From Swiss-Prot:
This is Bifunctional protein GlmU. UDP-N-acetyl-alpha-D-glucosamine binds at residues 8-11, 22, 72, 77-78, 139, 154, 227, 332, 350, 365, 376. The gene is glmU. Residues 251-451 are annotated as: N-acetyltransferase. Homotrimer. Pfam families: Hexapep, NTP_transferase. Mg(2+) binds at D102, N227. Keywords: Acyltransferase, Cell shape, Cell wall biogenesis/degradation, Cytoplasm, Magnesium, Metal-binding, Multifunctional enzyme, Nucleotidyltransferase, Peptidoglycan synthesis, Repeat, Transferase. The lineage of its organism: Bacteria, Bacillati, Bacillota, Bacilli, Bacillales. The active site is at H362. It is found in: Cytoplasm. Gene3D superfamilies: Hexapeptide repeat proteins, Spore Coat Polysaccharide Biosynthesis Protein SpsA, Chain A. It catalyses: alpha-D-glucosamine 1-phosphate + acetyl-CoA = N-acetyl-alpha-D-glucosamine 1-phosphate + CoA + H(+); N-acetyl-alpha-D-glucosamine 1-phosphate + UTP + H(+) = UDP-N-acetyl-alpha-D-glucosamine + diphosphate. The keyword Repeat applies. Its cofactor is Mg(2+). It comes from Staphylococcus epidermidis (strain ATCC 35984 / DSM 28319 / BCRC 17069 / CCUG 31568 / BM 3577 / RP62A).
Length: 451
């Protein structure tokens, strides 16, 4: 059976009080609508249509060709939004999942279970529900005395007894696709808001003797809809708890989960320890037995086994086995550290290969460079890579010793097993096995200050 999905992402999100459109606000480092799309895909859906309106181009830029798109010019309610997918889905057979783009905590497992329940019961519509102590703002699930679904009533249209019901609609549905688009034509807007409600499709199906089911999830957090900054923070907290719990259950020590932020695409090996205040995001892979020190930030990087990261910032870089970074170091994009490398305090590395066993221990800048095996870069040494218009490369061979406060004026090559005297400014290539001195001779003028 074919499976389709419609993601509702057209709303502006006025309560967010933001220039950014609601579904593009991030949770765990990723736009909410992207979380939704990823889980819809994992649920086994064949075709996705995203309904866009406010911020249409920004949403399309975020999701790219992972989805088809239909434009909702005026936001006239959820049924009206779903109807916009007519051009892509109206003539299709199968099941159509409808999901709101502001529900970043929904999991693919729950969506899978909803679809499977819908198809196994041969229903025309199945609604995903949950129970909560505080159902304010959600549509209520109304059942008859036999527990069978009768209708869904929105908060603003509910009477006092209906508002007291704790089982709520998530706004997520599975429909028989042909029935969905047939009934959408019959939905009216005679309600308090003057909008076309998607739950009215369910009422029309029941009125015509169709079959409606409810699938209840036990995790209310999954269906949280984010409408304001407070709910955004609640969603962030809930997703971080879920992510951190997953890693701890799989052998990672997180000393203070409440202050540790890990993205959904991060992979972490067993026996790695993460201290408080750490942020790890993007497509980062951390292997086994790594120590991530407090307040470190790592994005889109690979950290190999037994590395030790101390209070440092690492972006788009590779850190080798048994390598130490920090404290207070920065690896900028394109940094590649080999095994048993030391990059120490207040060192900045950018677009550089630092080979196995090399050391850059203090107060240095290494940019657009290649540093050979076991070479030592002295304190305060820098590669001077930029002339105001272009950047140039510095190559330092293996087993070299670069004295403190050395300036390597690129482009320049320093051979294997060389020694550069402290305080030198190197402008010419240095042959291997050489000593290079490039500094003015010291002159003492005795008694000068007594004049």
């Amino acid at each position: 059976m074919q499976r389709h999905a419609i993601i509702l992402a057209a709303g502006k999100g006025t309560r967010m009080k933001s220039k950014k459109y609601k579904v593009l606000h991030e949770v765990a480092g990723k736009p909410m609508v992207e979380h939704v799309l990823n889980n819809v895909k994992q649920a086994g859906v064949d075709q996705i249509v995203t309904i866009i309106g406010h911020g249409a181009e920004s949403v399309k830029d975020t999701l790219g060709n992972q989805s088809l798109y239909s434009f909702q010019d005026k936001q006239l309610g959820t049924a009206h939004a779903v109807k916009m997918a007519h051009e892509h889905l109206a003539d299709k057979e199968g099941t159509t999942l409808v999901v709101c783009g502001d529900t970043p905590l929904i999991t693919y497992q729950t969506l899978q279970s909803l679809i499977e329940h819908h198809e196994s019961t041969q229903s025309h519509v199945t609604v995903l529900s949950a129970s909560t102590i505080n159902p304010y703002g959600y549509g209520r699930i109304i059942r008859n005395h036999n527990g069978i679904l009768e209708r869904i009533v929105e908060e603003k249209d509910a009477n006092d007894s209906e508002r007291a019901i704790k089982e709520i609609s998530s706004g997520i549905f599975a429909f028989n696709n042909r029935v969905l688009f047939e009934k959408l034509e019959q939905v009216k807007n005679d309600n308090a808001q003057g909008e076309y409600y998607l739950p009215d499709v369910l009422s029309l199906i029941l009125k015509d003797g169709g079959k409606a089911e409810v699938y209840c999830t036990e995790d209310f957090d999954e269906i949280i809809g984010v409408n304001d900054r407070l709910m955004l923070s609640e969603a962030e907290k809930a997703l971080q708890q879920r992510i951190n719990r997953y890693h701890m259950e799989n052998g990672v020590t997180i000393i203070d989960p409440s202050s540790t932020f890990i993205g959904t695409d991060v992979k972490i090996g067993i026996d790695t320890t993460i201290e408080p205040g750490v942020r790890i995001g993007g497509h980062t892979t951390i292997e086994e037995d790594v120590w991530i020190g407090q307040y470190s930030e790592i994005n889109n990087s690979t950290i190999h086994s037994n590395a030790n990261i101390k209070q440092s910032v690492i972006n788009d870089s590779i850190v080798g086995e048994n390598t130490t970074v920090g404290p207070f170091a920065q690896l900028r994009p394109g940094s590649n550290l080999g095994s048993e490398v030391k990059v120490g305090n207040f060192v900045e590395v950018k677009k550089a290969d630092i080979k196995d066993g090399a050391k850059v221990s203090h107060l240095s800048y290494i940019g657009d460079a290649e540093i050979g095996e076991r070479t030592n870069i002295g304190c305060g040494s820098i590669t001077v890579n930029y002339d105001g218009a272009n950047k140039f490369k510095t190559i330092v061979g293996k087993d070299a010793f670069i004295g403190c406060n050395t300036n390597l004026i690129a482009p320049v090559t320093v051979g294997n097993h060389t020694l550069i005297a402290a305080g030198s400014t190197i402008t010419d290539n240095i042959p291997e096995d050489s000593l290079a001195l490039a500094r003015a001779r010291q002159v003492n003028k005795e008694g000068y200050l007594k004049k």
